[in-house]
Curated annotation (Swiss-Prot):
Its main location: endoplasmic reticulum. A motif (Prevents secretion from ER) lies at residues 673-675. GO terms for molecular function: ATP binding; ATP-dependent protein folding chaperone. It comes from Arabidopsis thaliana. In cooperation with other chaperones, Hsp70s are key components that facilitate folding of de novo synthesized proteins, assist translocation of precursor proteins into organelles, and are responsible for degradation of damaged protein under stress conditions. Required for pollen development and pollen tube growth. May be required for the early stages of female gametophyte development, but not for polar nuclei fusion during female gametophyte. Possesses ATPase activity in vitro. This is Heat shock 70 kDa protein BIP3.
Amino acid sequence: MIFIKENTAKMTRNKAIACLVFLTVLDFLMNIGAALMSSLAIEGEEQKLGTVIGIDLGTTYSCVGVYHNKHVEIIANDQGNRITPSWVAFTDTERLIGEAAKNQAAKNPERTIFDPKRLIGRKFDDPDVQRDIKFLPYKVVNKDGKPYIQVKVKGEEKLFSPEEISAMILTKMKETAEAFLGKKIKDAVITVPAYFNDAQRQATKDAGAIAGLNVVRIINEPTGAAIAYGLDKKGGESNILVYDLGGGTFDVSILTIDNGVFEVLSTSGDTHLGGEDFDHRVMDYFIKLVKKKYNKDISKDHKALGKLRRECELAKRSLSNQHQVRVEIESLFDGVDFSEPLTRARFEELNMDLFKKTMEPVKKALKDAGLKKSDIDEIVLVGGSTRIPKVQQMLKDFFDGKEPSKGTNPDEAVAYGAAVQGGVLSGEGGEETQNILLLDVAPLSLGIETVGGVMTNIIPRNTVIPTKKSQVFTTYQDQQTTVTINVYEGERSMTKDNRELGKFDLTGILPAPRGVPQIEVTFEVDANGILQVKAEDKVAKTSQSITITNDKGRLTEEEIEEMIREAEEFAEEDKIMKEKIDARNKLETYVYNMKSTVADKEKLAKKISDEDKEKMEGVLKEALEWLEENVNAEKEDYDEKLKEVELVCDPVIKSVYEKTEGENEDDDGDDHDEL
């Protein structure tokens, strides 16, 4: 490997200072330029974008909203719920998403997929991924260093990337919005944890593309929640701390809100800490209890774990309002019914180290923002896990008795903010949103490797984005014609302790003694937090650039296209399945309506002749038997069978109605008074 280092050896002190001043001014101008370009890009988007929906793609639940008729509408799904489980399942006949998938998980564990957000943008050998796999009933395999989900679909084994599963959930949210708005939707703002790295952000964008969405902006979840909190807040400047503890991720962001300007001062967090981890602790506790009490190891029994997971999640939720619950599971294993108490105190004891772990990012965010505890005006709670009383108490104690704000719905705040940002970008937000300005930050320092494996930062963490920064480096060896630019993100001083984002070679450097060539490296982070790196030989005028998108784990354009095609096939299959179910329901409904008509002696039944009645009962009985024997018939078969039944029943019912109307007219005639 060839390292490069800064060319400062031959500078005099005065020249160095002059150069530093010049570069600082230049850097400032470049930042202004980047912001202006971003502004122009947004104006361009406003002209061509349709309605832009806001989607909170959560680990455990997802939510969709839209800025509509001068306010944000959080949209209920087809089950009437405003949040949808981030679950996908495959049965022998169909694909299920949301509640339908989660509700059948216990009897179909190996083909029910959840938590794709904990895998997205990560490598297979990531310790967090390996830790999660032991709790997952479905199979996660290594494909090109990435975690892929292996599941049986219609008899054959298929591999799905986390992006594809996430795309299925996004498709469900898109369809939910389309049903509400009555039109097709293409454009969306999608939220990600503030501490998501470059690879995870890009993978989320890819998931949007697979779902057929144009992801116009990726915004950070705490920033979305801050918008929800501060949209209607008038008056002077205030500092707010957003504490976002969700199902699988944790973020802390500190923002200044001042009349519609939302400026992020700092952000910190843990992309692998949330409610699921609390569930896992409780599951571990009961797995050990079962082993001790019944001498049975259920840790590899996927059905038992599925039942236990569901009940542990319910128990956790109940303990936010009660001090004790009983975890009861019918036939947990070998016909044994499980029933054990769980107290709030035990739950807190099992998770105390995790609760305490959330306080470290709070301290870090305050330090990075240069603020004291007393400088925070409001604490905003986001994410379902913030309902846990111990979490609220620890936060209150840390802030010397300050009560967190309860004004925002922790499940919906992020989608609400994303919908507002969608209204800003589309122009549909009108006057209410025209003064909103988001100034977000890069969550991690970005830099390159220089001599000795040193991390040289180009963009420090918490730099306002979009941004563009450059530094000049030089060669390390005489006559060097190629340098390798290794790009990293992280806060450690050595690159081996940070995360490699990618690398590329700059070739065609004019041969010269070491220290002579001038190589300018430019880092540009867009409004989505995605990085592009460019290296240019200032003398030879040769340059090379790459968009850093986790070049080892990123889906290729071809893979994305293939996944889009597969997603369209699934959508077509879903449509066919829905039409089939609708046709079956239509036939069933007709048959049962006719049965009750024939049986109802108080109404029409007594007016149907015995011969017609026998004919109708015969065809209805035959139709019900046919339905039992043809569970997986095609839509056309159900339609054909309905026509057969209607052919017998409709003329009889029509004739009875006509006869009844005639009798009513005769009766009416008799009742008229004489003039």
